[in-house]
Amino acid sequence: VLFRSCWVALTYNKKNIRKYMEPNENLVIVIAFGIPANWGYNHKSKLPRQVSNVSDNSPQWFKDGVDCALNAPTAINQQKFMLTLVDDKVKAKAKFAPSAKVDLGIVKYHFEVGSGKDHSIWI
């Protein structure tokens, strides 16, 4: 069975969800999982060079990490992040966007999965 997921940060009614939360819980995003009624469409994705300093001479793990990061869901599918290879480490920066810090965390996780590196890769 194939499932789809979607996360939403700005376009939902928080009052309807708060009734299911404890008073000390903080709501950041909502994630929906399920089998879609229709499969929607693919969103346009940026090129690796638009979100990183990747080049022909970059190590394969960095190229693979950037490719995987481009598949990370971001707010309004804007992909407003920059991954910069500095020596053997990576600097990740969020550009101004709604939910930029949430986006960057998801992007960094996708990069780690694609590159085969762990959290120690980050500057």
Regions found by a protein language model. Give the residues of each.
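Acidic, surface-exposed loops and disordered segments
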Residues: 1-123
